[in-house]
Amino acid sequence: VLWRAGIAALQTDQLERAATNLRGLVQRRPTGELTPAALYWLGIAEQRLGRVAAAVDTFRSLTTRYPYHYYGVRGLERLRDETLAGSSADGSSPRSRLSFPELKLTRATVDAPELQSATLLARAGLSLDAADTAWTLLQQRSHDRGLAFLTAMALATAGDYARASRVVTNHFGEFLRRPAGNLPQNFWQLVYPRPFRSDVKAAAEANGMDPLMLYAIMRQESRFDPSARSAVGALGLFQIMPATAAAIGPSVGVGNVSNDESAMIEPSVNAAIGAALASRLLTMFDGHLAPVAASYNAGEDLARVWWTAVDGLREDYFVDAIPYSETRRFVREVLTNYASYRRLYANSTP
């Protein structure tokens, strides 16, 4: 009730009422998405009321508690807003709230013949066979988080980023949105890898795009699985529909591959079409990623209607006004992905 009342008041410019309701909701410490969402929009209400110190305190609380969450990312953007200049975030690392578990294999896992086989295969340079063997053992010993992380690294080494990402999400999901101490050095690289780099780099350069933006879309569309297929027939890393392949393929030099599934799922082909599509959508939406992501999930026509409806308001208003919950989640994830990729790789070679 407080959430609906707070957002309704914000939408009708009843800012004091919005702040009161959202503050009350935060004080109740709701579970799930409500706490970061309420903190974010409370900060907006305070900012619009001109209460700069209260807005900064609220956004800082949000970014400290949920630095990798969608609303935490948005909160950091708000702290950098010129209207909050002089009170912005200092860029320091968020306070640790969680402690990453000790990654120690159980005795039963150490003694398992499958682990010994995986070790021998890895030493022989058979990385995919080693990863498959570790994966099979993990299905039997899913409680062993040391084995889970070892399996994720083995899969990534073998180039199977789809399964590596799945293992990290399934076994260490609580660390993807909340700050934690003593994370393994390569933890975030497993969560946000850069597979098929030459293909993505070439596609990005051909379309004047940031390759990290393409990875943000790819991660949400296919989880890095080049053979991914949706229920409606979208294929590959960027989930390209045959009609899209027919329309864009010839213009990017890959020809009309709409009737050739094996060609469509080829990473270089799929990336070329996906990047061209993303570039066209970015032009259509004046460089804003949120409506581009909405177009990928719900179609260009609906995204255009929703974007027009917010009439020049900031992206955060657009995202939370999307009426389809699936599309809303999809867009939030793409934006969070992009912020995370930039955090990890902005200063590195594409």
Briefly describe each language-model feature range.
Residues 1-3, 8, 12-23, 27-40, ...:
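Catalytic glycan-binding domains that act on GlcNAc-containing polysaccharides
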Residues 107-136:
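Alpha-helical segment of the N-proximal tetratricopeptide repeat
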